[in-house]
């Protein structure tokens, strides 16, 4: 009667429900953060006079730096204390507080402090959701559970800007109040439905992840791809709303539409592009996607000045190439290190990605005043192509026949 197959099926169903709940919580938390990007020009430039492009870019750089620093700290503490739920509850509560405080200050340095703290509490919650998804998964259901979790995460990234564009038209602070409400839901659901797992799985430390890069130096190839892909995401999330507002004079709803059109192909292509890379190889797909992404990104600023409709077409194509490159870069980690070291490999991969998305807004703030808006897109597009050349040289010389 004690059929192990039935036991596995029951456990799989139970863990899938838990991961589904974590996915919903992630959808709420990430959507809350994503809806703020669309009306940043009004929220910052209209409230704080004399803000330079570099100072403007610090609003997002501060957020991503908190993700980089507190994300690591949260992982270490949650493993050491073998606790998860408390980080979700504290994270949601802190997010509510600092989303509100950002609407109250008229000092830009204080706003940046609140932004850092808001990001710290936000990443505390959603990174714990990701850790819990791993805790509730075993080898026989990990792939499916990560697919479910990833679908909610991607949906939030695409849904946030679209929703933000609509609600921002009702008032500059409405996205922030909405973010507070979404985190109230996270806090309530966390209190009622979330429990710590009976056994927690220890995640690798950052030091362990970088030690793995010494024994498996091929990791630098997907790491470079992720570093610059995320750098471009950070650049686009800062530069595009600014460009649409100051250069084209578009309102919040159209800015939200633009970001959603960029995100939609990326979301849709995650699964099919992953399957395609299984069949035809990772690196070839990364080369094709990176060439297309770099070329299109280079001309976005120029084409955008010719008309909004043309810009939307270019953003859709850009999102398509972004969707082509993301799955094979992540899959390369598993190819290189194997399942037993995949967590450490992903730690290295994600650290470089978080570093890239932190640098992206700063790059916009530095380049734009010197070269202008359109040329800033040219520079970051050429940067994509230059890093692709570096990776091609690495794969054909240093790592020949070790990456396909």
Residue ranges and their predicted role:
Residues 44-45, 77-78, 163-169, 244-245, ...:
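Interfacial helix-cap and linker-helix signal at transmembrane-aqueous boundaries
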Residues 175-191, 377-392:
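Symmetry-related core transmembrane helices of the 12-TM Major Facilitator Superfamily/SLC fold
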Residues 109-117, 309-317:
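Paired small-residue
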Residues 2-16, 195-225:
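Juxtamembrane intracellular "pre-TM" segments in multi-pass secondary transporters
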Residues 70-82, 270-281, 368:
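Helix-to-loop junctions at the C-terminal end of transmembrane segments
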Residues 86-100, 284-299:
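Structural signature of the two symmetry-related core transmembrane helices
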Residues 13-64, 221, 230-248:
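Helix-loop boundary and gating motifs at the non-cytosolic
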Residues 116-152, 332:
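Cytoplasmic helix-loop-helix junction between adjacent transmembrane helices
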């Amino acid at each position: 009667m004690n059929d192990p197959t039935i036991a596995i099926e029951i456990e799989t169903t139970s863990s899938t429900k838990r991961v589904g709940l974590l996915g919903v919580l992630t959808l709420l938390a990430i959507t809350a953060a994503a809806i703020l990007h669309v009306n940043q020009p009004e929220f910052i430039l209209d409230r704080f006079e004399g803000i330079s492009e570099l100072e403007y870019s610090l609003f997002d750089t501060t957020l991503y730096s908190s993700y980089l620093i507190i994300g690591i700290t949260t992982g270490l503490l949650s493993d050491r204390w073998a606790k998860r739920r408390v980080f979700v509850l504290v994270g949601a509560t802190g997010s509510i507080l600092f989303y509100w405080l950002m609407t109250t200050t008229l000092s830009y340095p204080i706003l940046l402090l609140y932004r850092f703290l808001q990001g710290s509490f936000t990443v505390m919650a959603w990174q714990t959701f990701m850790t819990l998804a791993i805790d509730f998964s075993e080898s026989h259901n990990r792939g499916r559970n990560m697919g479910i979790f990833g679908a909610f995460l991607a949906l939030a990234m695409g849904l946030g800007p679209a929703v933000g564009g609509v609600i921002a038209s009702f008032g500059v602070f409405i996205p922030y109040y909405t973010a507070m409400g979404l985190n109230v839901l996270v806090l309530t659901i966390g209190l009622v439905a979330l429990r710590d797992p009976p056994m927690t799985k220890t995640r690798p430390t950052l030091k362990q992840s970088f030690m793995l890069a010494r024994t498996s130096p091929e990791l630098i190839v997907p790491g470079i791809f992720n570093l610059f892909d995320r750098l471009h995401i950070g650049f686009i999330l800062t530069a595009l709303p600014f460009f649409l507002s100051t250069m084209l004079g578009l309102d919040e709803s159209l800015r939200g539409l633009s970001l959603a059109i960029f995100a939609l192909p990326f979301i849709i292509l995650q699964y099919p592009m992953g399957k395609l890379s299984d069949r035809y190889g990772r690196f070839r797909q990364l080369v094709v996607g990176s060439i297309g992404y770099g070329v299109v990104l280079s001309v976005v600023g120029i084409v955008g000045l010719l008309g909004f409709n043309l810009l939307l077409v270019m953003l859709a194509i850009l999102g398509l190439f972004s969707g082509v490159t993301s799955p094979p870069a992540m899959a390369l980690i598993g190819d290189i290190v194997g399942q037993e070291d995949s967590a450490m490999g992903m730690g290295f991969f994600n650290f470089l990605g978080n570093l890239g998305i932190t640098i992206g807004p700063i790059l916009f703030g530095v380049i734009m005043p010197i070269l202008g808006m359109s040329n800033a897109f040219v520079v970051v597009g050429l940067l994509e192509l230059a890093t692709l050349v570096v990776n091609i040289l690495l794969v054909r010389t240093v790592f020949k026949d070790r990456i396909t």
